[in-house]
Amino acid sequence: MKVLFDTSVLVAAHVPSHAEYSSARLWLERAKQGAFEFVVAAHTLMETYAVLTRLPLKPRIMPATAFQFLETNVLATARVVALTAEDYRDLLKSLASTGTGGGIVYDSLLVKAAELAQVDVLLTFNLKHLQRLWPAHAEKINAPNLLTPI
């Protein structure tokens, strides 16, 4: 089974005070144990780093700590899926043809990575936006607190 994690899951898995920490952390630990193929979109790495280093926590998560989390928990075990320039062009064309704009376009990068990796599950706490972008595969989109890992 291939499972793609989005930023919302990775952030929750790193922040013990996050409301969904337990479910996200369980999925991350199972991924690191090799229970399934762990997949992330390349842009998710940068987005997770950006979010972690700007969360209003005390003490703040320092850039070196955010990098260490990604290095140890994600880069060491996950397959990173990167979009090509042609993928970006096709995605922009599709978004323009459907009149889709604004911040949701960043979620479309995640959906495209999920398609390219042929994942079985796209794990997110952002269900509605992703189901809107990938209606043909809405059943693949799930939240860590709604699905038990293998």
Predicted feature residues:
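Short, well-structured N-terminal submotif of metal-dependent ribonuclease cores
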Residues: 1-40, 55-68, 132, 145-150
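Alpha-helix/helix-capping structural signal
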Residues: 8-9, 43, 109, 128
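Active-site-proximal, substrate-binding regions of enzyme catalytic domains
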Residues: 25, 49-79, 87-89
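Short beta-strand segments at enzyme active-site cores
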Residues: 39-42, 124
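Active-site neighborhoods of divalent-metal-dependent phosphate/nucleic-acid chemistry enzymes
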Residues: 79-127
